[in-house]
């Protein structure tokens, strides 16, 4: 089944006003419930563990295994668009209950073999439960996108946000993912003009 593309809020015609209101409401609800702060705390707790894991693997294999890491918190606009894409009610409660990628970390490795080493080590981190794994290396998306996505849940959390997504890919895979995103965004922008 082909995913329906949702145009970014700024590009929508008459429905833009409704979506803009939904985004504003989501932004306000996220502020009231300190969602960004909770996501950042999850990221801040996970990041040192990934860096330690990288140092350990680099020592074992006598070379740099993890090139770099980045993190992000899903924006209110992206949350609203994803809820629409999944035909879900647009509310903070629904987002927190159903979206497992509000907080995310991307781990860029040197080589494909390293991706599997790092993903395997992340799955076994103490204090986290692996909830879901998507292997887009074995089964790439139609666009050619390749990566491993891990959804983890901290064993002990006092937050409303109970999941963090870790994407692990090689530098070459990351280059393709960035290029694909830019091409897709450029085509959507052209279609809206």
Predicted features along the sequence, with ranges:
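Surface-exposed, low-hydrophobicity interaction/linker segments
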Residues: 38, 42-88
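Glycine-rich, low-complexity intrinsically disordered segments
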Residues: 10-11, 66-69, 95-96, 108
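An acidic, glycine-/histidine-flanked metal-binding catalytic module
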Residues: 2-57, 160-193
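Long beta-strand-rich cores associated with HINT superfamily self-processing modules
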Residues: 96, 108-193
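Terminal, regulation- and interaction-focused segments at domain boundaries
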Residues: 102-108
